[in-house]
């Protein structure tokens, strides 16, 4: 049985993809394709695989987690599944950690090496979606405020914009942790709101027709953020005037973030040093120009803390 991981990144349409997979789980199962999403992985399946500081010493929770995963994989094979797709962006880290460190998934290598051991060489493919950095960070910071974070200070924003860590570094760490896996990079700008295309071109599987076009868990707008701040007694005037998407960066910072992303994409187009494959939708002549209707914001309500249980639905 092949195991395929869909690992985000956060803020790239993961909730929409997971909803699509959940709604079509029956026809996929009939075709020998199983699906595990956050509703399963965050209810104890992965607990202990990545250690937390508060865990008592001497308890080998990692080995227990590996055994638990292996039991579930054995059960999936016994049901006749040929492929298992697992989608959970918290495997690579959390938005909370990204905001705290001002960096993109600084622990992705260590985390994914633990998942590699848990799946014992059964991983065939990893699907990863980057997003233009100024939009990624704007979305992440907006959702952070909605989940209790303070509005970031200028020094924090400047540090994020000046960070040298881009998606190239994230993908390099991922490839080092999973040297045997086929890493397929599918940019948000091309595949946003098109989960069936992501499944077909990322996993190489025949995808059920998606009759319900939805864009789930959008990031909060400026108006939403003002209400959030007012509800907790904070001053909403720290945010700029307007009703649409919040962009906290200066024009110079936006330019720096766009330049880093352009360098990342150039590296991917050049072959990514053999570490990953940039998957491009041949039905589109120009990526990133046609997106689903509605605000270009995306999010997952429980992505900031991987200890939370995914909402049903």
Enumerate the predicted regions with their spans:
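Anion-recognition interface
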Residues: 1-313
């Amino acid at each position: 049985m092949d195991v395929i991981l869909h690992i985000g990144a956060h803020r790239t349409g993961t909730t929409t993809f997971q909803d699509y997979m959940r709604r079509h789980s029956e026809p996929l199962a009939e075709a020998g394709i199983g699906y595990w999403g956050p509703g399963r992985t965050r209810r104890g399946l992965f607990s202990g695989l990545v250690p937390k500081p508060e865990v008592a010493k001497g308890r080998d929770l990692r080995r227990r987690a590996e055994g638990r995963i292996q039991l579930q994989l054995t059960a999936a094979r016994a049901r006749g599944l040929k492929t298992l797709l697992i989608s959970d962006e918290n495997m690579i880290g959390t938005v909370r950690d990204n905001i705290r460190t001002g960096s993109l998934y600084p622990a992705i290598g260590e985390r994914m090496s633990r998942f590699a051991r848990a799946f014992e060489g059964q991983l065939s493919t990893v699907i990863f979606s980057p997003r233009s950095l100024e939009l990624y960070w704007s979305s992440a910071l907006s959702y952070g405020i909605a989940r209790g974070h303070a509005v970031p200070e200028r020094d924090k924003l400047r540090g994020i914009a000046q960070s040298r860590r881009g998606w190239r570094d994230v993908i390099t760490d991922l490839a080092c942790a999973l040297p045997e896996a086929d890493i397929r990079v599918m940019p948000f700008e091309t595949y946003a709101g098109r989960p069936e295309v992501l499944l077909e071109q990322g996993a190489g599987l025949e995808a059920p027709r998606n009759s319900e076009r939805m864009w789930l868990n959008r990031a909060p707008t400026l108006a939403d953020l003002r209400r959030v701040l007012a509800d907790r007694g904070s001053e909403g005037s720290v945010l700029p005037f307007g009703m649409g998407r919040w962009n906290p960066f200066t024009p110079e910072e936006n330019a720096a973030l766009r330049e880093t992303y352009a360098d990342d994409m150039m590296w991917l187009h050049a072959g990514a040093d053999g570490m990953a494959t940039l998957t491009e939708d041949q039905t589109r002549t120009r990526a990133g120009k046609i997106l689903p209707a509605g605000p270009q914001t995306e999010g997952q309500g429980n992505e900031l803390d991987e200890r939370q249980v995914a909402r049903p639905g």
